[in-house]
Amino acid sequence: MAQVINTNSLSLITQNNINKNQSALSSSIERLSSGLRINSAKDDAAGQAIANRFTSNIKGLTQAARNANDGISVAQTTEGALSEINNNLQRIRELTVQASTGTNSDSDLDSIQDEIKSRLDEIDRVSGQTQFNGVNVLAKDGSMKIQVGANDGQTITIDLKKIDSDTLGLNGFNVNGGGAVANTAASKADLVAANATVVGNKYTVSAGYDAAKASDLLAGVSDGDTVQATINNGFGTAASATNYKYDSASKSYSFDTTTASAADVQKYLTPGVGDTAKGTITIDGSAQDVQISSDGKITASNGDKLYIDTTGRLTKNGSGASLTEASLSTLAANNTKATTIDIGGTSISFTGNSTTPDTITYSVTGAKVDQAAFDKAVSTSGNNVDFTTAGYSVNGTTGAVTKGVDSVYVDNNEALTTSDTVDFYLQDDGSVTNGSGKAVYKDADGKLTTDAETKAATTADPLKALDEAISSIDKFRSSLGAVQNRLDSAVTNLNNTTTNLSEAQSRIQDADYATEVSNMSKAQIIQQAGNSVLAKANQVPQQVLSLLQG
């Protein structure tokens, strides 16, 4: 090895080793002071990335556990409110059982109804005011997603329902049949629920009116009023329009003792084209079985021609010049005797007029308006109803009434209309009006109406309605109990996962103090030795002086 002065290689090597050891000592001191094995990416690039992902998961799962606990609180709050609603329903059921017995006076029933109404109002109050962190949990149908994981899509859904007297089917619940039920103001949601067709702010809703029947047309007739009607004669052939008088006592329509043309007799007894009707003609007590054709011709039951003789009687001898071939019109016009014709359940009794041959006086039985009309006839005086083939026709199969090509319906006010749709308008303030600007409401049956209230009626099968309401509450509470248990399980799992991830992260990221203290001690000793050796190395160039002094 050459002896030089300018470069002290031993000193340089020693300094380099001291610097390396200094870095190791610094790293050990940093790890011991922070408690972390990885203080920056240079310590362990891959380990730092893995540990950082663990940090995200751990923090996310910790928050998810808090979210799940909040979800449990929501379910508990909702279930607690439902418990109170159930208590009110049980009391209402108890009162309903009490009201169902016949020993109650009207005053007793009124008192029971008052408490029932108060209980229903309390149910509505609980529904509208039960909140969790400002969220109404029983005021509307909806779902609340609870994030129970550190990643997207890791949720549990709490299904919430609107629970009030309306959704429970108890709006207007009544045990005494008195008072009125306030309808609720209609909203956009009600129009949407009615499957409305929307154009701008106009919502067109199918009204669901019932098809009008003949009885609906006759509903306005009162005692003594007349109805102009086309009545089927029993053979499927419609007669021309005739006035019928309504008798409120017997609830029947009749056409009695009417003076009319002899030809009018045929419209009650003439069968359809191609058909033949069999019946009996009785003249002054003498009966004759006959056949009547579609043109009104009268023949014997065996098909032989019949004639009317000068006395007004039927005969088979057609040789006399004074005989007239028998027909309904000639029989009525030429006969001055009491005559009755019975065919197909329709009976006409008439007497001809010898002075005015073309005029007869007769009464009709059997050709009455359909029985369905009787049930809907009401006392509305002064209302004459025109019911003719020119105005309305009745489908013989369904009984539905049509007007031209349009079907006729009965609206909610029992008025006739050819439209089965109703237009509603959504205003800027959220209110709903009809075409006339009247406010629109929703009644207890969910129908849209302009009536602010509906006359109360005793609820049909009230105990059944209450049992169904209680059952719906039980079902909702069961679902909330199930979701509470699920969330509780989720919290336990989240805590376990967080613990395991934290341990895994610690193994990667945290400093091992035993190892690091050993490394620090080693580095300190080496540092001290290095400093001593460096002093010795720095003295090596002085050996060259001994050569110069020699």
Swiss-Prot record:
Coiled coil: none
Keywords: Bacterial flagellum, Secreted
GO cellular component: bacterial-type flagellum; extracellular region
InterPro entries documented for this protein: Flagellin (IPR001492), Flagellin_C (IPR046358), Flagellin_C_sub2 (IPR042187), Flagellin_N (IPR001029), FliC_H7 (IPR032826)
Keyword Transferase annotated: no
Gene3D superfamilies assigned to the protein according to its UniProt record, in alphabetical order: 6.10.280.190, f41 fragment of flagellin, C-terminal domain, f41 fragment of flagellin, middle domain, f41 fragment of flagellin, N-terminal domain, Flagellar export chaperone, C-terminal domain
UniProt subcellular location: Secreted; Bacterial flagellum
Pfam entry (one): FliC
An example Gene Ontology molecular-function term: structural molecule activity
Main location: secreted
Membrane-crossing residue ranges in chain numbering: none
Alphabetical list of SUPFAM superfamilies matching this protein: Phase 1 flagellin
Family: Belongs to the bacterial flagellin family.
Function summary: Flagellin is the subunit protein which polymerizes to form the filaments of bacterial flagella.
Full protein name: Flagellin
Species of the source: Shigella flexneri
Gene: fliC
